[in-house]
């Protein structure tokens, strides 16, 4: 109820709105009656004050300060009984109230302030009672509708009929879930604004790009935002009845989304359980794999590629639980985005690793650009929306479904390889590890022990030994060719022979022994990693 509604109450029949008419839409939630000098300290937002102005009769200039303070506090207005202690409202006071759009009501002398307060409060209570009755009726109506199995779209249509406006249901990432009408709204452009809407409160905003006004109510489950009820028009904040109806619809939708989410979780659990058993090779036969795979629309003779994704642990202060919740949110978002994937995808989770199993073509070169582009775009979205980074490992193409466990191993190895190099937000394509990569997987202490035991005194940092070590390294690189070694070192052939004999003496082994040369080659490769 606003000031203009108050003026229609019978108790205000002979009252006049003499100032601040531009503030006629100010909401009135309560009425107060007081004549104390410190009255302003007891007033609240949206409160209407009625007074005889007794405390102002000798200090009429204080009225201007009272108006300023009330306007600052967001009070609804001021009702003054004139012709008793205050004969008239001064012109400068009226001008001041007009400048603040702060309503001043001139009350007739013959009506008691108590009657005005009681009549106004009764009217407010009647309106609140009607609104609550309307909300209860709406909630019952919407609940019965959902319980009868008619679905969300039909419910949105009912809400739309009440509001006489289109109604859209968006998920927490601003993607359209359902709508009452076929309507084109670029929800992606609204994502940034919707993310700033906090708490389960009704909000209105306008966008500069399309010059449209939107009304939105976030939908919550377990104190977690699970979507938005969006109306592409202005719903007046003063229309409490309509807002209560929208809130009841949001409550019912929240329960329906909770039910749908429970069904999705059951489906995900069954899917993930199958995949885990499959890649761990716990099924007893190929026929069992074929039959179970059919449930998840996986074809036996189809070629597949596996992508393993994992949230990067950028901040070590994040707890395991926080990281797991963030990981769940990111991969739930990824699952929703897979409808735009360039090849038919199947999504699974194994622990905190998200797995995309792609129905592949014959050649990786045909798929490379579009797959990498999708993953890079997703990484950008995660960075913007979740303030985290995610990395991916990609396998080679496998020829049949039975080979998928090997493809998963390749994707996991590629992901681990990227993390070992301390990279973040990477996309690593699997390739067979060469010697340095295999050596990196070993503990540094083990590398040092092998290096020292193989090279013995040659491993020490002495000048003479260093020249011997360098000669030995070049000799092994040139496939034990003495002439080529001398040529590369710019020394005489006899010098090379002397140094190699010295090496054999220090090592106590022959350089013609294949086992010895293999160990020496490995030790020299390790030298670069250790240093």
UniProtKB/Swiss-Prot annotation:
<keyword id="KW-0805">Transcription regulation</keyword>
<comment type="function">
    <text>Activates the expression of pucFG, pucH, pucI, pucJKLM and guaD, while it represses pucABCDE and its own expression.</text>
</comment>
<dbReference type="Pfam" id="PF17853">
    <property type="entry name" value="GGDEF_2"/>
</dbReference>
<keyword id="KW-0238">DNA-binding</keyword>
<keyword id="KW-0678">Repressor</keyword>
<keyword id="KW-0010">Activator</keyword>
<dbReference type="Pfam" id="PF07905">
    <property type="entry name" value="PucR"/>
</dbReference>
<dbReference type="GO" id="GO:0003677">
    <property type="term" value="F:DNA binding"/>
</dbReference>
<dbReference type="InterPro" id="IPR012914">
    <property type="entry name" value="PucR_dom"/>
</dbReference>
<comment type="similarity">
    <text>Belongs to the CdaR family.</text>
</comment>
<dbReference type="GO" id="GO:0003700">
    <property type="term" value="F:DNA-binding transcription factor activity"/>
</dbReference>
<dbReference type="InterPro" id="IPR042070">
    <property type="entry name" value="PucR_C-HTH_sf"/>
</dbReference>
<keyword id="KW-0804">Transcription</keyword>
<dbReference type="InterPro" id="IPR025736">
    <property type="entry name" value="PucR_C-HTH_dom"/>
</dbReference>
<keyword id="KW-0659">Purine metabolism</keyword>
<dbReference type="InterPro" id="IPR041522">
    <property type="entry name" value="CdaR_GGDEF"/>
</dbReference>
<dbReference type="GO" id="GO:0006144">
    <property type="term" value="P:purine nucleobase metabolic process"/>
</dbReference>
<dbReference type="GO" id="GO:0045893">
    <property type="term" value="P:positive regulation of DNA-templated transcription"/>
</dbReference>
<dbReference type="Pfam" id="PF13556">
    <property type="entry name" value="HTH_30"/>
</dbReference>
<dbReference type="InterPro" id="IPR051448">
    <property type="entry name" value="CdaR-like_regulators"/>
</dbReference>
<protein>
    <recommendedName>
        <fullName>Purine catabolism regulatory protein</fullName>
    </recommendedName>
</protein>
